[in-house]
């Protein structure tokens, strides 16, 4: 992710979440040495989605991931999560974690398909009272992927 990507990333973020991250939040992630924000682009360089990953010791956490509504269902989300998994494999991390809103059925289905398991919930985590589902993926159990 670069400064040039931010306007598009912010549009996708606003279209995807009721409480979107701010420009400052993305800039902080871009400047933090343990954070690895990335974008997925179309063949003509248009940003179609993004993922923000943070590494802490031998674990990584997906902090934010979203796909432009016009590109949803095209495999961009999966490609971004595959990138995160490959990142963990290359760095020999043991665990990839995330949290997802209980009502985000498409994302939950994708994560389960990729091997993530529910490990807990944060009750009433979101402003509207929705729970957050905590999910983990053991990197040692993941088959090789070449997304990096």
Please place each PLM-identified region on the residue numbering.
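Short hydrophobic clusters on alpha-helical segments that form packing/core surfaces
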Residues: 84-88, 96, 107
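Conserved catalytic-core motifs of GNAT/GCN5-like acyltransferases
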Residues: 99, 112, 117-133
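Well-formed, non-transmembrane alpha-helical positions, independent of function
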Residues: 8, 109-110
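Short amphipathic helical patch at the helix-1/turn junction of helix-turn-helix
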Residues: 67, 101-102
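Conserved hydrophobic beta-strand within the GNAT/NAT acetyltransferase core sheet
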Residues: 62, 96-100
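Short glycine/proline-centered loop/turn elements that form peptide/ligand docking sites
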Residues: 77, 81, 104-107, 124-129
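Acetyl-CoA-dependent GNAT
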Residues: 3-72, 81-91, 120, 138-148
């Amino acid at each position: 992710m670069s400064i040039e990507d931010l306007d598009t990333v912010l549009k996708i973020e606003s279209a995807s979440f009721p409480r979107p991250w701010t420009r400052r939040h993305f800039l902080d992630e871009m400047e933090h040495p343990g954070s690895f924000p990335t974008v997925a682009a179309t063949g003509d360089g248009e940003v179609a989605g993004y993922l923000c990953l943070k590494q802490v010791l031998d674990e990584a956490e997906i902090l934010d991931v979203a796909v432009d509504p016009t590109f949803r269902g095209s495999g961009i989300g999966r490609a971004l999560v595959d990138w995160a998994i490959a990142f963990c494999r290359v760095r020999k991390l043991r665990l990839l974690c995330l949290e997802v809103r209980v009502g985000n059925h498409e994302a939950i289905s994708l994560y389960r398909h990729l091997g993530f398991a529910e490990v807990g919930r944060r009750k009433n985590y979101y402003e509207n009272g929705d729970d957050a589902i905590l999910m983990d993926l053991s990197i040692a159990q993941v088959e090789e992927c070449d997304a990096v």
